[in-house]
Protein backbone atom coordinates (compact mmCIF):
# COMPACT_ATOMS: atom_id res chain seq x y z
CA UNK A 1 0.00 0.00 0.00
CA UNK A 2 1.52 3.32 -1.02
CA UNK A 3 -0.55 5.45 1.31
CA UNK A 4 -0.98 8.08 -1.39
CA UNK A 5 -3.94 8.97 -3.57
CA UNK A 6 -2.22 11.03 -6.25
CA UNK A 7 -0.51 13.73 -4.18
CA UNK A 8 -2.88 13.35 -1.25
CA UNK A 9 -2.64 11.23 1.90
CA UNK A 10 0.74 10.24 3.31
CA UNK A 11 2.04 9.98 6.87
CA UNK A 12 2.86 13.41 8.27
CA UNK A 13 3.46 12.26 11.84
CA UNK A 14 6.16 12.39 14.53
CA UNK A 15 8.64 9.50 14.79
CA UNK A 16 6.83 8.23 17.89
CA UNK A 17 3.76 7.38 15.84
CA UNK A 18 5.59 5.95 12.83
CA UNK A 19 6.29 2.53 14.36
CA UNK A 20 2.67 2.13 15.41
CA UNK A 21 1.50 2.98 11.88
CA UNK A 22 3.94 0.50 10.34
CA UNK A 23 2.73 -2.21 12.74
CA UNK A 24 -0.90 -1.31 12.01
CA UNK A 25 -0.41 -1.48 8.24
CA UNK A 26 1.37 -4.83 8.50
CA UNK A 27 -1.36 -6.34 10.69
CA UNK A 28 -4.16 -4.90 8.56
CA UNK A 29 -2.64 -6.35 5.37
CA UNK A 30 -2.30 -9.76 7.05
CA UNK A 31 -5.85 -9.64 8.44
CA UNK A 32 -7.30 -8.73 5.03
CA UNK A 33 -5.71 -11.83 3.49
CA UNK A 34 -6.83 -14.02 6.40
CA UNK A 35 -10.04 -15.89 5.54
CA UNK A 36 -10.88 -16.48 9.21
CA UNK A 37 -10.54 -12.80 10.09
CA UNK A 38 -12.76 -11.69 7.21
CA UNK A 39 -15.26 -14.43 8.02
CA UNK A 40 -15.46 -13.21 11.63
CA UNK A 41 -15.85 -9.60 10.46
CA UNK A 42 -18.72 -10.60 8.16
CA UNK A 43 -20.29 -12.65 10.95
CA UNK A 44 -20.51 -9.59 13.22
CA UNK A 45 -21.76 -7.34 10.41
CA UNK A 46 -24.54 -9.84 9.81
CA UNK A 47 -25.44 -11.09 13.28
CA UNK A 48 -24.64 -8.03 15.38
CA UNK A 49 -25.23 -5.07 13.08
CA UNK A 50 -28.01 -6.59 10.98
CA UNK A 51 -26.49 -6.39 7.49
CA UNK A 52 -27.24 -6.35 4.65
CA UNK A 53 -29.16 -3.08 4.94
CA UNK A 54 -32.01 -2.63 2.45
CA UNK A 55 -31.85 -0.54 -0.72
CA UNK A 56 -35.25 1.10 -0.42
CA UNK A 57 -37.17 2.59 -3.34
CA UNK A 58 -38.50 5.91 -2.01
CA UNK A 59 -41.63 5.79 -4.12
CA UNK A 60 -43.52 8.63 -2.42
CA UNK A 61 -40.56 10.98 -2.60
CA UNK A 62 -39.91 10.00 -6.22
CA UNK A 63 -43.54 10.74 -7.17
CA UNK A 64 -43.55 14.00 -5.26
CA UNK A 65 -40.44 15.24 -7.09
CA UNK A 66 -41.59 13.87 -10.43
CA UNK A 67 -38.27 12.89 -11.96
CA UNK A 68 -35.57 10.30 -11.37
CA UNK A 69 -36.19 7.21 -9.27
CA UNK A 70 -34.70 7.66 -5.81
CA UNK A 71 -33.33 4.71 -3.87
CA UNK A 72 -32.10 5.02 -0.29
CA UNK A 73 -29.29 2.83 1.02
CA UNK A 74 -30.59 2.33 4.54
CA UNK A 75 -27.47 2.60 6.70
CA UNK A 76 -29.75 4.12 9.34
CA UNK A 77 -30.97 0.58 10.03
CA UNK A 78 -27.60 -0.61 11.32
CA UNK A 79 -27.20 -1.35 15.02
CA UNK A 80 -26.35 2.03 16.66
CA UNK A 81 -28.16 3.85 13.87
CA UNK A 82 -25.48 4.75 11.34
CA UNK A 83 -22.77 3.46 9.02
CA UNK A 84 -20.08 3.97 11.70
CA UNK A 85 -20.42 0.45 13.10
CA UNK A 86 -19.18 -1.14 9.83
CA UNK A 87 -15.75 0.36 10.37
CA UNK A 88 -15.63 0.03 14.15
CA UNK A 89 -16.30 -3.72 14.09
CA UNK A 90 -13.42 -4.15 11.64
CA UNK A 91 -10.98 -2.04 13.63
CA UNK A 92 -11.84 -3.54 17.02
CA UNK A 93 -11.45 -7.06 15.63
CA UNK A 94 -8.04 -5.92 14.41
CA UNK A 95 -7.22 -4.49 17.86
CA UNK A 96 -8.16 -7.83 19.40
CA UNK A 97 -5.95 -9.65 16.89
CA UNK A 98 -3.07 -7.33 17.85
CA UNK A 99 -3.65 -8.08 21.57
CA UNK A 100 -4.47 -4.48 22.49
CA UNK A 101 -6.35 -4.12 25.76
CA UNK A 102 -7.73 -0.61 25.33
CA UNK A 103 -9.35 1.33 22.51
CA UNK A 104 -9.67 5.09 22.12
CA UNK A 105 -11.62 7.15 19.61
CA UNK A 106 -12.53 10.71 18.74
CA UNK A 107 -16.12 11.68 18.08
CA UNK A 108 -17.98 14.73 16.81
CA UNK A 109 -21.68 13.96 16.60
CA UNK A 110 -21.13 11.14 19.05
CA UNK A 111 -22.11 8.43 16.53
CA UNK A 112 -18.59 7.07 16.12
CA UNK A 113 -18.11 7.28 19.88
CA UNK A 114 -21.28 5.31 20.48
CA UNK A 115 -20.33 2.71 17.87
CA UNK A 116 -16.84 2.33 19.39
CA UNK A 117 -18.20 2.08 22.94
CA UNK A 118 -20.76 -0.48 21.72
CA UNK A 119 -18.21 -2.77 20.09
CA UNK A 120 -15.76 -2.31 22.98
CA UNK A 121 -18.48 -3.44 25.40
CA UNK A 122 -19.19 -6.52 23.33
CA UNK A 123 -15.51 -7.46 23.01
CA UNK A 124 -14.78 -6.63 26.66
CA UNK A 125 -12.25 -3.87 26.03
CA UNK A 126 -11.52 -0.72 27.99
CA UNK A 127 -12.71 2.31 26.03
CA UNK A 128 -12.07 6.05 26.22
CA UNK A 129 -13.73 8.57 23.92
CA UNK A 130 -12.40 12.08 23.29
CA UNK A 131 -15.02 14.66 22.48
CA UNK A 132 -14.89 18.44 22.06
CA UNK A 133 -16.60 20.39 24.82
CA UNK A 134 -18.88 22.16 22.34
CA UNK A 135 -19.95 18.86 20.79
CA UNK A 136 -20.63 17.44 24.26
CA UNK A 137 -23.17 20.22 24.81
CA UNK A 138 -24.85 19.60 21.46
CA UNK A 139 -24.96 15.83 21.80
CA UNK A 140 -25.69 15.17 25.47
CA UNK A 141 -27.82 12.16 24.61
CA UNK A 142 -24.96 10.38 22.84
CA UNK A 143 -22.59 11.28 25.68
CA UNK A 144 -24.85 9.54 28.18
CA UNK A 145 -25.25 6.62 25.80
CA UNK A 146 -21.45 6.12 25.69
CA UNK A 147 -21.30 6.19 29.50
CA UNK A 148 -24.14 3.66 29.68
CA UNK A 149 -22.02 1.41 27.45
CA UNK A 150 -19.16 1.63 29.95
CA UNK A 151 -16.92 4.08 28.11
CA UNK A 152 -15.08 6.99 29.69
CA UNK A 153 -15.90 10.26 27.89
CA UNK A 154 -13.14 12.86 28.11
CA UNK A 155 -14.07 16.47 27.26
CA UNK A 156 -11.55 18.36 25.11
CA UNK A 157 -11.36 22.05 26.00
CA UNK A 158 -8.56 23.12 23.65
CA UNK A 159 -9.07 24.97 20.36
CA UNK A 160 -12.70 25.28 19.31
CA UNK A 161 -13.75 22.30 21.40
CA UNK A 162 -14.91 20.34 18.37
CA UNK A 163 -13.91 17.29 16.33
CA UNK A 164 -10.48 18.51 15.16
CA UNK A 165 -9.45 19.11 18.78
CA UNK A 166 -10.78 15.71 19.84
CA UNK A 167 -8.60 14.10 17.15
CA UNK A 168 -5.50 15.96 18.40
CA UNK A 169 -6.18 14.80 21.94
CA UNK A 170 -6.74 11.18 20.85
CA UNK A 171 -3.45 11.20 18.92
CA UNK A 172 -1.66 12.55 22.04
CA UNK A 173 -3.12 9.74 24.13
CA UNK A 174 -2.20 7.14 21.53
CA UNK A 175 1.45 8.26 21.45
CA UNK A 176 1.63 7.95 25.24
CA UNK A 177 -0.05 4.53 25.45
CA UNK A 178 1.03 3.02 22.17
CA UNK A 179 1.82 -0.46 23.50
CA UNK A 180 -1.59 -1.45 24.83
CA UNK A 181 -3.88 1.01 23.02
CA UNK A 182 -5.55 0.90 19.60
CA UNK A 183 -6.78 4.17 18.10
CA UNK A 184 -10.07 3.63 16.27
CA UNK A 185 -10.35 6.48 13.74
CA UNK A 186 -13.93 7.19 12.69
CA UNK A 187 -13.52 8.42 9.14
CA UNK A 188 -11.34 8.08 6.03
CA UNK A 189 -8.88 10.58 7.51
CA UNK A 190 -5.58 10.59 9.36
CA UNK A 191 -2.21 9.15 8.37
CA UNK A 192 -1.88 6.06 6.17
CA UNK A 193 -3.09 3.27 6.60
CA UNK A 194 -6.25 4.74 8.19
CA UNK A 195 -7.94 6.24 5.09
CA UNK A 196 -7.51 2.95 3.21
CA UNK A 197 -8.44 0.78 6.16
CA UNK A 198 -11.62 2.71 6.98
CA UNK A 199 -12.63 2.69 3.30
CA UNK A 200 -12.11 -1.07 3.13
CA UNK A 201 -14.30 -1.60 6.20
CA UNK A 202 -16.98 0.74 4.79
CA UNK A 203 -17.03 -0.55 1.21
CA UNK A 204 -19.61 -3.13 2.25
CA UNK A 205 -22.15 -0.30 1.74
CA UNK A 206 -21.31 0.08 -1.95
CA UNK A 207 -20.79 -3.63 -2.54
CA UNK A 208 -24.31 -4.32 -1.26
CA UNK A 209 -25.87 -1.34 -3.04
CA UNK A 210 -24.37 -2.42 -6.35
CA UNK A 211 -25.68 -5.96 -6.05
CA UNK A 212 -29.09 -4.70 -4.85
CA UNK A 213 -29.62 -2.18 -7.65
CA UNK A 214 -28.66 -4.79 -10.25
CA UNK A 215 -31.26 -7.11 -8.72
CA UNK A 216 -33.96 -4.43 -8.63
CA UNK A 217 -33.29 -2.52 -11.84
CA UNK A 218 -31.02 -4.77 -13.87
CA UNK A 219 -28.55 -1.93 -14.28
CA UNK A 220 -26.28 0.45 -12.41
CA UNK A 221 -27.53 3.83 -11.13
CA UNK A 222 -26.85 7.11 -12.93
CA UNK A 223 -25.94 8.88 -9.69
CA UNK A 224 -24.65 7.87 -6.27
CA UNK A 225 -24.95 10.69 -3.74
CA UNK A 226 -23.55 10.85 -0.19
CA UNK A 227 -22.75 13.50 2.40
CA UNK A 228 -19.11 14.31 3.10
CA UNK A 229 -17.60 15.40 6.42
CA UNK A 230 -14.46 13.33 6.68
CA UNK A 231 -16.21 11.20 4.09
CA UNK A 232 -16.31 7.56 5.21
CA UNK A 233 -19.95 6.86 4.34
CA UNK A 234 -19.35 8.45 0.92
CA UNK A 235 -16.09 6.57 0.32
CA UNK A 236 -17.83 3.35 1.37
CA UNK A 237 -20.61 3.70 -1.18
CA UNK A 238 -18.43 5.31 -3.92
CA UNK A 239 -15.54 2.86 -3.92
CA UNK A 240 -17.21 -0.15 -5.59
CA UNK A 241 -18.53 2.15 -8.35
CA UNK A 242 -15.26 3.95 -9.16
CA UNK A 243 -14.46 1.76 -12.17
CA UNK A 244 -18.02 2.14 -13.51
CA UNK A 245 -17.41 5.37 -15.36
CA UNK A 246 -21.08 5.82 -16.33
CA UNK A 247 -22.04 6.20 -12.65
CA UNK A 248 -21.71 9.80 -11.46
CA UNK A 249 -20.44 10.11 -7.89
CA UNK A 250 -21.53 13.19 -5.97
CA UNK A 251 -20.33 14.19 -2.50
CA UNK A 252 -22.33 16.82 -0.61
CA UNK A 253 -20.55 19.03 1.91
CA UNK A 254 -22.06 21.22 4.63
CA UNK A 255 -22.51 24.82 3.49
CA UNK A 256 -23.80 25.85 6.93
CA UNK A 257 -25.22 29.37 6.79
CA UNK A 258 -23.93 29.78 3.24
CA UNK A 259 -20.69 29.24 1.39
CA UNK A 260 -19.82 32.97 1.43
CA UNK A 261 -20.55 33.55 5.13
CA UNK A 262 -17.48 31.81 6.54
CA UNK A 263 -19.87 29.71 8.65
CA UNK A 264 -19.66 26.40 6.81
CA UNK A 265 -17.59 23.21 6.55
CA UNK A 266 -17.09 22.96 2.78
CA UNK A 267 -13.39 22.07 2.51
CA UNK A 268 -13.66 21.03 -1.14
CA UNK A 269 -15.52 24.15 -2.24
CA UNK A 270 -13.54 26.69 -0.23
CA UNK A 271 -10.42 24.95 1.01
CA UNK A 272 -6.81 24.72 -0.11
CA UNK A 273 -4.28 21.90 0.08
CA UNK A 274 -2.47 21.48 3.38
CA UNK A 275 -1.55 19.01 6.11
CA UNK A 276 -3.71 18.10 9.12
CA UNK A 277 -3.92 15.01 11.32
CA UNK A 278 -1.09 13.31 9.46
CA UNK A 279 -2.50 13.62 5.92
CA UNK A 280 -2.27 15.98 2.96
CA UNK A 281 -5.70 17.01 1.73
CA UNK A 282 -8.07 19.94 1.19
CA UNK A 283 -8.45 22.01 4.37
CA UNK A 284 -10.24 25.14 5.49
CA UNK A 285 -7.21 27.19 6.53
CA UNK A 286 -6.02 30.79 6.49
CA UNK A 287 -2.96 32.18 4.63
CA UNK A 288 -0.70 31.06 7.48
CA UNK A 289 -2.08 27.52 7.30
CA UNK A 290 -4.02 27.87 10.55
CA UNK A 291 -7.19 25.78 10.60
CA UNK A 292 -10.28 27.95 10.41
CA UNK A 293 -13.33 27.41 12.63
CA UNK A 294 -15.99 25.38 10.84
CA UNK A 295 -19.73 25.23 11.31
CA UNK A 296 -22.67 23.06 10.34
CA UNK A 297 -26.04 22.33 11.89
CA UNK A 298 -24.93 18.71 11.82
CA UNK A 299 -22.12 17.93 14.27
CA UNK A 300 -20.95 15.04 12.10
CA UNK A 301 -20.04 17.27 9.15
CA UNK A 302 -18.12 20.04 10.89
CA UNK A 303 -14.65 18.71 10.11
CA UNK A 304 -12.24 21.27 8.57
CA UNK A 305 -10.79 18.77 6.09
CA UNK A 306 -11.81 15.82 3.98
CA UNK A 307 -10.43 12.31 3.41
CA UNK A 308 -7.43 12.29 1.02
CA UNK A 309 -9.05 9.83 -1.37
CA UNK A 310 -11.93 12.28 -1.82
CA UNK A 311 -9.39 15.02 -2.57
CA UNK A 312 -7.95 12.72 -5.24
CA UNK A 313 -11.38 11.86 -6.69
CA UNK A 314 -12.10 15.57 -6.98
CA UNK A 315 -8.76 16.40 -8.58
CA UNK A 316 -9.01 13.51 -11.04
CA UNK A 317 -12.62 14.51 -11.85
CA UNK A 318 -13.97 11.06 -10.95
CA UNK A 319 -16.32 12.54 -8.35
CA UNK A 320 -18.02 15.89 -8.08
CA UNK A 321 -18.38 17.77 -4.81
CA UNK A 322 -21.29 20.12 -4.14
CA UNK A 323 -22.82 21.52 -0.97
CA UNK A 324 -26.11 22.03 0.86
CA UNK A 325 -26.94 24.65 3.48
CA UNK A 326 -28.43 24.11 6.95
CA UNK A 327 -31.73 25.35 5.59
CA UNK A 328 -31.75 22.93 2.64
CA UNK A 329 -30.77 20.02 4.90
CA UNK A 330 -33.56 20.89 7.36
CA UNK A 331 -36.11 21.02 4.54
CA UNK A 332 -34.95 17.60 3.29
CA UNK A 333 -35.05 16.26 6.87
CA UNK A 334 -38.71 17.33 7.17
CA UNK A 335 -39.61 16.12 3.68
CA UNK A 336 -38.28 12.61 4.10
CA UNK A 337 -39.87 12.32 7.53
CA UNK A 338 -43.26 13.32 6.18
CA UNK A 339 -43.26 11.57 2.79
CA UNK A 340 -41.55 8.29 3.68
CA UNK A 341 -41.82 8.08 7.46
CA UNK A 342 -38.03 7.93 7.74
CA UNK A 343 -36.30 10.50 9.96
CA UNK A 344 -32.79 10.90 8.53
CA UNK A 345 -29.67 12.13 10.31
CA UNK A 346 -28.98 15.80 9.54
CA UNK A 347 -25.74 14.64 7.92
CA UNK A 348 -27.61 12.36 5.49
CA UNK A 349 -30.19 15.12 4.93
CA UNK A 350 -27.46 17.12 3.15
CA UNK A 351 -27.11 14.35 0.54
CA UNK A 352 -30.86 14.09 0.30
CA UNK A 353 -31.21 17.85 -0.19
CA UNK A 354 -28.97 17.71 -3.25
CA UNK A 355 -30.74 14.63 -4.63
CA UNK A 356 -34.07 16.43 -4.26
CA UNK A 357 -32.70 19.35 -6.31
CA UNK A 358 -31.33 17.01 -8.96
CA UNK A 359 -34.18 14.51 -9.37
CA UNK A 360 -36.83 16.83 -10.91
CA UNK A 361 -34.35 17.78 -13.68
CA UNK A 362 -33.87 14.16 -14.69
CA UNK A 363 -36.18 11.74 -16.49
CA UNK A 364 -38.16 8.88 -15.00
CA UNK A 365 -35.60 6.52 -16.54
CA UNK A 366 -32.79 7.89 -14.39
CA UNK A 367 -31.79 6.24 -11.12
CA UNK A 368 -30.31 7.95 -8.07
CA UNK A 369 -28.97 6.14 -5.01
CA UNK A 370 -28.69 8.29 -1.88
CA UNK A 371 -26.66 6.92 0.99
CA UNK A 372 -28.88 7.41 4.03
CA UNK A 373 -25.89 7.23 6.34
CA UNK A 374 -27.72 7.48 9.65
CA UNK A 375 -31.01 7.95 11.46
CA UNK A 376 -32.14 11.26 12.88
CA UNK A 377 -33.07 10.37 16.46
CA UNK A 378 -29.93 12.13 17.70
CA UNK A 379 -30.96 15.32 15.85
CA UNK A 380 -34.53 15.70 17.05
CA UNK A 381 -33.43 18.13 19.80
CA UNK A 382 -31.49 20.28 17.33
CA UNK A 383 -34.38 20.43 14.89
CA UNK A 384 -36.88 21.21 17.66
CA UNK A 385 -34.68 24.10 18.79
CA UNK A 386 -34.51 25.52 15.25
CA UNK A 387 -38.30 25.25 14.95
CA UNK A 388 -38.70 26.95 18.32
CA UNK A 389 -40.23 23.90 19.99
CA UNK A 390 -39.52 23.32 23.69
CA UNK A 391 -38.91 19.66 24.50
Swiss-Prot record:
Superkingdom to which the source organism belongs: Bacteria
Residue numbers carrying N6-(pyridoxal phosphate)lysine: 84
InterPro entries attached to this UniProt entry: Trp_synth_b_CS, Trp_synth_beta, Trp_synth_beta/beta-like, TrpB-like_PALP, TrpB-like_PALP_sf
Pathway: Amino-acid biosynthesis; L-tryptophan biosynthesis; L-tryptophan from chorismate: step 5/5
Known cofactor(s): pyridoxal 5'-phosphate
Entry annotated with the keyword Transferase: no
GO terms assigned for molecular function: tryptophan synthase activity
UniProt keyword annotations, A-Z: Amino-acid biosynthesis, Aromatic amino acid biosynthesis, Lyase, Pyridoxal phosphate, Tryptophan biosynthesis
GO cellular component entries: cytoplasm
EC number(s) from the headed UniProt entry: 4.2.1.20
Pfam families: PALP
Reaction catalysed by this enzyme: (1S,2R)-1-C-(indol-3-yl)glycerol 3-phosphate + L-serine = D-glyceraldehyde 3-phosphate + L-tryptophan + H2O
Family: Belongs to the TrpB family.
Biological function: The beta subunit is responsible for the synthesis of L-tryptophan from indole and L-serine.
Subunit field text: Tetramer of two alpha and two beta chains.
The protein, known as: Tryptophan synthase beta chain
Gene field: trpB
Amino acid sequence: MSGRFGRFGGQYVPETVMNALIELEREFEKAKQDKDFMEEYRYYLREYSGRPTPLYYAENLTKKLGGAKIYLKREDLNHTGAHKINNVLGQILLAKRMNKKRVIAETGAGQHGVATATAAAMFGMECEIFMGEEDIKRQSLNVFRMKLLGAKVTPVKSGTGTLKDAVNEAIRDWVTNINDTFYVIGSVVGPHPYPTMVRDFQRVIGDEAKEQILQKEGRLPDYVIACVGGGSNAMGIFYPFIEDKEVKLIGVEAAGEGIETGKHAAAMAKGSVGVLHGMMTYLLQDEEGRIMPVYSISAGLDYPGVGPEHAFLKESNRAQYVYATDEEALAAFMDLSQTEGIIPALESAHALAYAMKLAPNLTKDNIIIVNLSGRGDKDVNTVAKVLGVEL
